[in-house]
From Swiss-Prot:
GO MF annotation terms: RNA binding; translation initiation factor activity
Lineage: Eukaryota, Metazoa, Ecdysozoa, Nematoda, Chromadorea
Chief place where the protein resides: cytoplasm
Annotated protein name in UniProt: Eukaryotic translation initiation factor 3 subunit I
GO cellular component, one term: eukaryotic 43S preinitiation complex
Protein role: Component of the eukaryotic translation initiation factor 3 (eIF-3) complex, which is involved in protein synthesis of a specialized repertoire of mRNAs and, together with other initiation factors, stimulates binding of mRNA and methionyl-tRNAi to the 40S ribosome. The eIF-3 complex specifically targets and initiates translation of a subset of mRNAs involved in cell proliferation.
Naturally occurring in which organism (per UniProt): Brugia malayi (Filarial nematode worm)
Intracellular or extracellular location(s): Cytoplasm
Length: 327
């Protein structure tokens, strides 16, 4: 199928998200306005204007009522999805690097970077508590991190948050139990973790790392179950909601791209079998590394965002949907 190529950002993409209904696509980049698009035809509905810096991460609630963004302008904003109005702005000590909305859509978890006297931290805010969101009261949960975390995700409903840090470790915190780590895997990756995503049923967690691998973990115990090897650093990985497949995206780092040909940069998205760890398909299209990937909830298409500033919606053809792996 011919992919849709969407141009709405002046600079590199940092995150694409699809709502649970699968009809809206949200994208954020290193420019200051996240965009929202129709998945069906790639028409841009509008932008969320209010930030003054790079948008590092975004997330959307299950009912598509709320949308949140983490930015380098030291603000985390909660938006009304439909109108594009800012509901709350939370001031952060340093730039916010990653953000995740909980299963219920009531709690926001985000991580901040280490800068000068400020240590990297994990925060959890309750969006129902106006005094918390306005900064009058302390957040629901706060934890100083020894190593900066570039990704965070809710793992068990509204109870536990996982962070992936620059040393390649995965740590899990239970917000009901104070600031102790519940689970950890300090041998998850050799280099920094760039992205973490959950499976639809919340039983698996996939991580993408600079060490040229993506790994599948048990979301409860953080045991490593599978390793998917690539030839270049992996920036993003996602699990198919309907098949035993995972998709990896990455490529040669942006600053090294001038020294490589497009073919050796490995700028394709790669499909692997979840169980057998074998690559069986690739998508070309981006002329730079892929920074972010998301599967459609129906499992029939995948969205990628690249360093080239384009969002691509790649629909799977019937060959893929009928494809069965030979044992």
């Amino acid at each position: 199928m011919k992919p849709l190529s969407l141009k709405g950002h002046d600079r590199a993409l940092t995150r694409v998200r699809i709502n649970r209904d699968g009809d809206l696509l949200f994208s954020a980049g290193k420019d200051k306005s996240p965009c929202v698009w129709y998945m069906e035809n790639g028409e841009r509905i509008g932008t969320y204007d209010g930030h003054n810096g790079v948008i590092w991460d975004i997330d959307v609630s299950w009912d598509t009522r709320h949308f949140c963004s983490a930015s380098g302008d030291v603000f985390v904003k909660l938006w009304n999805c439909e109108t594009g109005d800012v509901i709350n702005s939370v001031s952060t000590p340093t730039a916010a690097r990653s953000i995740s909305l909980s299963y219920s859509g009531n709690l926001i978890a985000f991580t901040t970077i280490k800068m000068t006297q400020n240590v990297a931290s994990l925060f959890v805010y309750d969006i129902r508590d106006g005094s918390q969101m306005s900064g009058e009261n302390q957040p629901t949960f706060r934890k100083s991190l020894q190593t900066q975390a570039n990704s965070c995700v809710w793992t068990h409903l509204d109870d536990t948050v996982c962070v992936g840090n620059e040393k390649g470790n995965v740590h899990q915190y239970d917000i009901r139990k104070g600031d102790d780590i519940v689970n950890f895997n300090d041998e998850a990756h050799k280099f920094q973790i760039n992205d973490m995503q959950m499976s639809t049923d919340e039983s698996f967690l996939i991580t993408a790392s600079k060490d040229k691998t993506a790994r599948l973990f048990d979301a409860r115990t953080l045991d490593c179950l599978k390793t998917y090897k690539a030839e270049r650093p992996v920036n993003s990985a996602a699990i198919s909601p309907i098949r035993d497949h995972v998709i990896l995206g990455g490529g040669e780092e942006a600053m090294k791209v001038t020294q490589t040909t497009a073919a050796s940069g490995h700028f394709e998205a790669k499909l692997y079998h979840l169980v057998f760890e074998e690559e069986f398909a690739r998508f070309k299209g981006h002329f730079g590394p892929i920074n972010t990937l998301a599967f459609h909830p129906g499992g029939n298409c995948v969205v990628s965002g690249g360093e080239d500033g384009y969002v691509r919606i790649q629909e799977f053809d019937t060959d893929y949907l009928k494809f069965d792996y030979d044992f």
